[in-house]
Protein backbone atom coordinates (compact mmCIF):
# COMPACT_ATOMS: atom_id res chain seq x y z
CA UNK A 1 0.00 0.00 0.00
CA UNK A 2 1.43 3.34 -1.07
CA UNK A 3 0.34 6.51 0.73
CA UNK A 4 -0.02 9.82 -1.10
CA UNK A 5 1.99 11.54 1.63
CA UNK A 6 4.93 9.21 0.93
CA UNK A 7 4.87 10.06 -2.78
CA UNK A 8 4.69 13.78 -1.96
CA UNK A 9 7.59 13.55 0.51
CA UNK A 10 9.75 11.69 -2.02
CA UNK A 11 8.90 14.19 -4.78
CA UNK A 12 9.75 17.12 -2.50
CA UNK A 13 13.09 15.50 -1.65
CA UNK A 14 14.09 16.07 -5.30
CA UNK A 15 13.77 19.87 -4.95
CA UNK A 16 17.17 21.41 -5.61
CA UNK A 17 18.37 18.58 -7.87
CA UNK A 18 20.16 20.22 -10.83
CA UNK A 19 18.63 19.89 -14.28
CA UNK A 20 20.33 17.26 -16.41
CA UNK A 21 18.81 16.05 -19.69
CA UNK A 22 17.94 12.34 -19.35
CA UNK A 23 19.18 12.31 -15.75
CA UNK A 24 17.35 10.51 -12.96
CA UNK A 25 19.57 10.81 -9.89
CA UNK A 26 18.31 12.80 -6.89
CA UNK A 27 20.77 15.48 -5.86
CA UNK A 28 22.91 14.91 -8.97
CA UNK A 29 20.73 15.65 -11.99
CA UNK A 30 17.31 15.00 -13.52
CA UNK A 31 14.96 16.19 -16.20
CA UNK A 32 11.17 16.13 -15.77
CA UNK A 33 10.82 12.48 -16.76
CA UNK A 34 13.85 11.52 -14.68
CA UNK A 35 12.28 13.07 -11.60
CA UNK A 36 9.13 10.96 -12.02
CA UNK A 37 11.25 7.87 -12.76
CA UNK A 38 13.30 8.51 -9.63
CA UNK A 39 10.22 8.88 -7.45
CA UNK A 40 8.87 5.63 -8.94
CA UNK A 41 12.14 3.81 -8.15
CA UNK A 42 12.10 5.03 -4.56
CA UNK A 43 8.46 4.03 -4.05
CA UNK A 44 8.52 0.66 -5.86
CA UNK A 45 12.19 -0.31 -5.58
CA UNK A 46 12.87 -0.71 -9.31
CA UNK A 47 12.48 1.17 -12.58
CA UNK A 48 9.20 0.58 -14.43
CA UNK A 49 10.76 1.03 -17.85
CA UNK A 50 14.09 2.39 -19.01
CA UNK A 51 13.34 4.93 -21.73
CA UNK A 52 15.43 4.94 -24.88
CA UNK A 53 17.80 7.87 -25.42
CA UNK A 54 15.83 10.95 -26.42
CA UNK A 55 16.61 14.42 -27.71
CA UNK A 56 15.03 17.60 -26.42
CA UNK A 57 12.68 17.65 -29.44
CA UNK A 58 11.96 13.90 -29.28
CA UNK A 59 8.18 14.02 -29.50
CA UNK A 60 8.00 16.60 -32.26
CA UNK A 61 9.76 14.38 -34.79
CA UNK A 62 7.16 11.62 -34.65
CA UNK A 63 4.10 13.59 -33.55
CA UNK A 64 3.21 10.70 -31.23
CA UNK A 65 2.10 11.17 -27.63
CA UNK A 66 5.14 9.26 -26.37
CA UNK A 67 4.98 10.67 -22.84
CA UNK A 68 1.26 10.00 -22.38
CA UNK A 69 1.63 6.52 -23.91
CA UNK A 70 4.42 5.64 -21.45
CA UNK A 71 2.45 7.03 -18.50
CA UNK A 72 -0.56 4.96 -19.53
CA UNK A 73 1.56 1.79 -19.51
CA UNK A 74 2.62 2.21 -15.89
CA UNK A 75 0.29 4.65 -14.13
CA UNK A 76 -3.48 4.73 -13.64
CA UNK A 77 -5.23 7.36 -15.79
CA UNK A 78 -7.50 9.71 -13.82
CA UNK A 79 -9.53 12.79 -14.73
CA UNK A 80 -7.47 15.98 -14.68
CA UNK A 81 -10.12 17.56 -12.43
CA UNK A 82 -9.57 14.76 -9.88
CA UNK A 83 -5.76 15.11 -9.70
CA UNK A 84 -4.40 15.85 -6.23
CA UNK A 85 -1.23 15.57 -4.21
CA UNK A 86 0.80 12.51 -5.19
CA UNK A 87 -0.56 12.35 -8.74
CA UNK A 88 1.41 12.85 -11.96
CA UNK A 89 0.30 15.54 -14.41
CA UNK A 90 1.34 15.90 -18.05
CA UNK A 91 1.61 19.24 -19.85
CA UNK A 92 1.30 20.35 -23.47
CA UNK A 93 2.96 23.71 -24.04
CA UNK A 94 1.77 24.35 -27.61
CA UNK A 95 -1.49 23.33 -29.26
CA UNK A 96 -1.00 20.79 -32.01
CA UNK A 97 2.23 19.40 -30.56
CA UNK A 98 2.76 16.36 -28.34
CA UNK A 99 2.79 16.73 -24.56
CA UNK A 100 6.40 17.13 -23.43
CA UNK A 101 6.48 17.91 -19.72
CA UNK A 102 5.55 16.08 -16.54
CA UNK A 103 5.53 16.75 -12.81
CA UNK A 104 4.13 15.48 -9.52
CA UNK A 105 1.48 17.38 -7.61
CA UNK A 106 2.16 17.98 -3.91
CA UNK A 107 -1.33 19.42 -3.49
CA UNK A 108 -3.99 20.44 -6.00
CA UNK A 109 -2.20 23.77 -6.45
CA UNK A 110 1.47 22.76 -5.88
CA UNK A 111 3.81 20.97 -8.30
CA UNK A 112 7.33 19.54 -8.15
CA UNK A 113 9.01 19.46 -11.56
CA UNK A 114 12.32 19.90 -13.36
CA UNK A 115 12.90 22.22 -16.31
CA UNK A 116 15.99 23.15 -18.24
CA UNK A 117 17.69 26.22 -16.83
CA UNK A 118 17.34 25.51 -13.14
CA UNK A 119 17.05 22.88 -10.43
CA UNK A 120 13.94 20.88 -9.63
CA UNK A 121 11.52 23.15 -7.80
CA UNK A 122 8.13 23.22 -6.13
CA UNK A 123 5.84 25.83 -7.66
CA UNK A 124 2.26 27.05 -7.51
CA UNK A 125 0.02 25.63 -10.21
CA UNK A 126 -1.03 29.00 -11.60
CA UNK A 127 -3.75 29.36 -14.24
CA UNK A 128 -0.98 29.37 -16.90
CA UNK A 129 0.14 25.90 -15.78
CA UNK A 130 -3.39 24.60 -15.14
CA UNK A 131 -4.47 25.39 -18.73
CA UNK A 132 -1.65 23.23 -20.07
CA UNK A 133 -2.42 20.05 -18.11
CA UNK A 134 -3.64 17.49 -20.65
CA UNK A 135 -3.51 14.25 -18.65
CA UNK A 136 -3.29 13.06 -15.07
CA UNK A 137 -2.29 9.74 -13.56
CA UNK A 138 -2.17 8.08 -10.15
CA UNK A 139 0.64 5.82 -9.02
CA UNK A 140 -0.64 2.20 -8.90
CA UNK A 141 -1.88 1.11 -5.50
CA UNK A 142 -1.94 4.61 -4.03
CA UNK A 143 -4.21 5.27 -1.05
CA UNK A 144 -5.11 8.47 0.71
Description of each model-found segment:
Residues 24-43:
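Active-site nucleophilic cysteine motif
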Residues 19, 74-79, 132-135:
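Short secondary-structure junctions
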Residues 24, 124-125:
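Short, solvent-exposed loop/turn segments at secondary-structure boundaries
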Residues 18-27, 77-78, 100:
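Short helix-to-loop capping/linker segments positioned immediately adjacent to catalytic or ligand/cofactor-binding
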Residues 15, 43-44:
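A broad structural signal for alpha-helix termini and local helix breaks/kinks
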Residues 1-17, 125-144:
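Non-catalytic ligand/cofactor/substrate-binding and regulatory segments of enzyme domains
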Residues 2-8, 49-119, 126, 140:
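...with weaker cross-activation on analogous glycine-rich loops/strands in unrelated enzymes
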Amino acid sequence: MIKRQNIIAVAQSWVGTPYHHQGSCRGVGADCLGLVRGVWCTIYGAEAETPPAYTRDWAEASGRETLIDAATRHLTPIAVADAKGGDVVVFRFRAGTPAKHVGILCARERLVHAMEGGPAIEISVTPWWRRRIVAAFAFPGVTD
